[in-house]
A protein has these predicted regions:
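Conserved aromatic-histidine-acidic binding/catalytic patches
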Residues: 103, 137, 159
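Short acidic, glycine/Ser/Thr-rich loop/turn "cap" segments at secondary-structure junctions
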Residues: 96-103, 127-133, 152, 168-171
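Conserved AMP-binding loop of ANL adenylate-forming enzymes
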Residues: 120-148, 152-154
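Short glycine-enriched loops at secondary-structure junctions
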Residues: 108, 135-138, 162
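Conserved adenylate-forming
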Residues: 26, 37, 142-171
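Nucleotide 5′-phosphate-binding alpha/beta core
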Residues: 1-90, 95-113, 117-121, 125-127
Length: 171
């Protein structure tokens, strides 16, 4: 069987849950410290970052929905300083204001790694060619898949949508 990142893809349950808890605690502390909206919502629920001691404690965190994201448009939910944001993506906004997501350089590296793992599970290797037909605009799909394919070392055909005849020619 092929693994892109064998240590992470074959990690034991106990180690996986330890990593998940560490990352959850780090994320909760970062959003509590850096994002007034999240801090206020947590305070309304009577939750502090140190209350998250297990994965089951995820249930203590306040539920947030699309409306909350739209109400804090465009940058009210960013946990990183704006000068660390290297890319912005957004939803189409068909139900109101678009939902905006800002990515740091590290976010993009992690995103490419996660996509590479998924592609590796599907059997993609550096010997393959992957045609990316997702859009390359504000939607996150096109670039996310693109950089995951490149991380594996496979060839990317960044065709986006449309141009069916050209797509067939390149395949």
């Amino acid at each position: 069987m092929y693994y892109w990142n064998k240590p992470m893809e074959t990690i034991g349950r106990e180690d996986l849950e330890r990593i998940q808890l560490e990352r959850l605690q780090r994320t909760v502390l970062r959003m509590y410290t850096n994002v007034p909206f999240y801090r206020e919502r947590m305070q309304q629920q009577g939750v502090k970052p140190e209350d998250v001691q297990s994965l089951a404690d995820l249930r203590l965190l306040p539920f947030m929905d699309k409306r909350d994201l739209r109400d804090n448009y465009p940058f009210g939910t960013f946990a990183a300083p704006r000068q660390e944001i290297v890319r912005i993506h957004a939803s189409s906004g068909t139900t109101g204001k678009p939902i905006v997501a800002g990515y740091t350089a590290n976010d993009l590296q992690m995103w490419a790694e996660c996509v590479a793992r998924g592609l590796g599970c599907a059997g993609v290797t550096k010997k393959d060619t992957v045609q990316v037909a997702y859009g390359y605009g504000l939607f996150t799909g096109g670039l996310g898949l693109h950089y995951g394919v490149e991380r594996i070392g496979a060839t990317v055909v960044p065709i986006s949508a449309g141009n069916t005849k050209r797509q067939l020619m390149l395949m």
